[in-house]
Amino acid sequence: MNKLSSHVLVGENQETNFIYLMNIYTGCSVKVSRRIFKDVESIENNDEIMAFLDSEGFCKNTANLIQEVYDEESKQLNITFLIHENCNFRCTYCYEKFEKNAMEREVIDGVINYIAKRIQDDSRLEHVHLAWFGGEPLLNLKGIEYISENVIRLCEISNLSYSSDITTNGFLLNRRIYEKLTKLQVTNYQITIDGNQEHHDSQRVLKNGKGTYQRIIDNLLDISKNTKDSNLIALRTNVAPDNFESMPKHITKLISLFGEDERFDLNFHNVGNWGDKCIDIIKNNVALELSELTVSLGGKSEGILWNLMPNSYCYAGKKNNFVIGSDGMVYKCTVLLYDERNHIGNLENGKLKIDDKKESLWVADKMTDRCFSCPIGTACLNKKCPALLLSKKVENCLYNHEELNRMLKLMDQQNLFTYTVA
């Protein structure tokens, strides 16, 4: 008789009387009414529903799935470009030193040549993903255009799929540039708005100290009102003790501005000690709490649910993921830019010269025995943050049943379950 695999996350909603089943490996999710099945045991004792769940991968052996995760990882090449390492902002909590500028043309051509060679030589490769980061990437829009056009062409010739995302402060993201990026298949955008205008303008300022809030909001309103596409625009808020109390008003404001546009999603992150600056931080993770508040107010907040998605462990822990600096330095992580352990190599003449020992610090198998019985093991692989494990030697496990159950409820509230049995 089939049993649910250990990689299936089980939750419940006592208020609505539903059982939740989430297949972390495939992303398939099922909500089951307790009027039909009172508990998981009664589900497992029913041949009909178990046959259905088995067909959706809910009964697979977890140990075999781990290898499948790594096999899937080998089919993708992910490159993050520090396309411009300077910035037009000087955020108070930023960890970057802004010692470099636009990516050199020699480096740009070298990366394109590297990608072309990988596509030619690696028969396993099925997908190429490019991420634009900085500094502020839109300070080098021409570089983004040139690389995108060339790599898209390479993928089309070889029949590979392609995708792209950008992390930008939003100040330069007017409608014209947004439409240009969309044509270049940039489909995911992350823009930070740190609370209300007063708070945002106290810490996310231009080089000259002037505020940036209204310009960003105006850009996004223009995009919302005058463009139509299926992109995702994540509005990120960094939360600290000095802006936490103002979050309800901030969230309400963003919902009033963008709540009717399905492309916009509100994300929340605790401000972290990313550099050597003394910054007050909130010790408790408030991201889930604020996501719940957003949904209760009628907004959309799906970003936090990434923790439940397949292959959602950190890019830095993936073998086929590289961060390329503007001068050709190769990193694994975009945060520990000044840590020698993160300087894993250099781009030379269209080839990545990688220090295998340094790279292994990030990509080596870090799973423990209990990872194999953990419901989110196939998504996490104990690599949710390799930098944390590397720097602080702390346990990297993120399993918290109460929080995961709240995430399942958040999925339900946003009608994100794949199937309903009621």
Residue ranges of each PLM-predicted region?
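A broadly conserved sequence feature marking short terminus-proximal activation segments
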Residues: I43-C59, K318-K353
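Flexible mid-to-C-terminal extensions adjoining Fe-S/redox cofactors in radical SAM and related proteins
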Residues: L4-S5, L337-A422
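C-terminal accessory regions of radical SAM enzymes
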Residues: K300-Y338, M367-A387
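Conserved alpha-helical substructure of the radical SAM core
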Residues: L65-E179, T187
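N-terminal [4Fe-4S]-dependent radical SAM core
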Residues: K3-K31, N45-T80, S123
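Radical SAM enzyme [4Fe-4S]-AdoMet core and its adjacent flexible, acidic
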Residues: E198-K319, V323-D327
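Short glycine-enriched, charge-decorated loop/helix-capping segments at active-site entrances
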Residues: T26, K97-N101, S202-K210, S391
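Non-cysteine beta-strand/loop elements that form the S-adenosyl-L-methionine
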Residues: Y178, V186-Q197, R263-N270
